Amino acid sequence: MPTKNQLIRHGREEKQRTDRTRASDQCPQKQGVCLRVSTRTPKKPNSALRKIAKVRLSNRHDIFAHIPGEGHNSQEHSIVLVRGGRVKDSPGVKSHRIRGVKDLLGIPDRRKGRSKYGAERPKSK
């Protein structure tokens, strides 16, 4: 426990906060190149095959990004746009890929939540 005099002379050192957005450099989106596309099983008690991709961002950071929605046309060397947002049951996956931008196509025939999946507006009858 420091004395008052020691605190006046030196003060207290502030704790360094860990940066949650280290890979994105404080940017809302970042462009990257797909290195590998694979599936991963989630933590307990969930069960699925989550589609993920290893992406090298334009600032040379390698990250894992989740591919949302049903089905995708993603493969190695495709150019993608990545946003933040973790997948709670997949450790190490802290970002999402944006559908309907660059090489990752939107979901065809999707009617609800279209903006999240890059889907076109359906033709009215």
Swiss-Prot record:
Protein name (record): Small ribosomal subunit protein uS12m
Family matches, as InterPro entries: NA-bd_OB-fold, Ribosomal_uS12, Ribosomal_uS12_bac
Location of this chain's protein in the cell: Mitochondrion
Keyword NADP: no
Biased composition (Basic and acidic residues): 10-23
CDD domains registered for this protein in UniProt: Ribosomal_S12
A single cellular component GO annotation: ribosome
The species this protein was found in: Oryza sativa subsp. japonica (Rice)
Keyword RNA-binding attached: no
Short name of any one Pfam family annotated for the protein: Ribosom_S12_S23
Lineage: Eukaryota, Viridiplantae, Streptophyta, Embryophyta, Tracheophyta
GO molecular function, one term: structural constituent of ribosome
Function in brief: Protein S12 is involved in the translation initiation step.
Gene: RPS12
Domain of life, source organism: Eukaryota
Chain spans, region Disordered: 1-29, 105-125
One record GO biological process: translation
Main location: mitochondrion
